């Protein structure tokens, strides 16, 4: 019973809706030169990268269209994913129009790319979002903070174990989620010539 509670806690802690807010704030504090810049760009990141997708999920929950904020049923995940795709794309174009720092455009482009592929796969198979986003965050931290943050990838097996333990995913689904994010994050940041910021 205690193990199940621990697995559920891990599942909630590493939900993409929460870790994305921490990620945006920490990345902007590190990458930007002034508090003013952080105050300008961070709210836009959080609005389009966290709040809009999460608010739509809450809306579906309040309307009783879904029964769980983690959206366990595969077929129920498609609408939130579509909204997430739109939100990331809007965020990217806003950053492009406002001539935001290149890393922000890269971050939202890569998030959009990852979510599009998650949507396509989810249309026929339940892939893990949790392992996808913790892997995505790990690669993102590596790109922006340096090689030591690759150790964050050690969290992937923990999150994957938790999702399997509470019977939300199979082992194959958690591995697939992580692998997908690893590929899309590596490609996306390479496309913007950011992967060579740090070398192992």
Describe these PLM feature segments.
Residues 101-200:
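Membrane-embedded catalytic cores of phosphoryl/pyrophosphoryl-handling enzymes
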Residues 28-40:
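Short, hydrophobic transmembrane alpha-helix segments
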Residues 53-64:
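Membrane-water interface of transmembrane alpha-helices
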Residues 10-31:
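The first (N-terminal) embedded transmembrane alpha-helix
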Residues 19, 82-93, 113, 132-135:
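Core segments of transmembrane alpha-helices
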Residues 38-52, 110:
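Alpha-helical transmembrane segments
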Residues 1-8:
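Short, Lys/Arg-rich, polar N-terminal cytosolic tail immediately upstream
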Residues 67-84:
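Juxtamembrane helix-capping/reentrant segments at transmembrane boundaries
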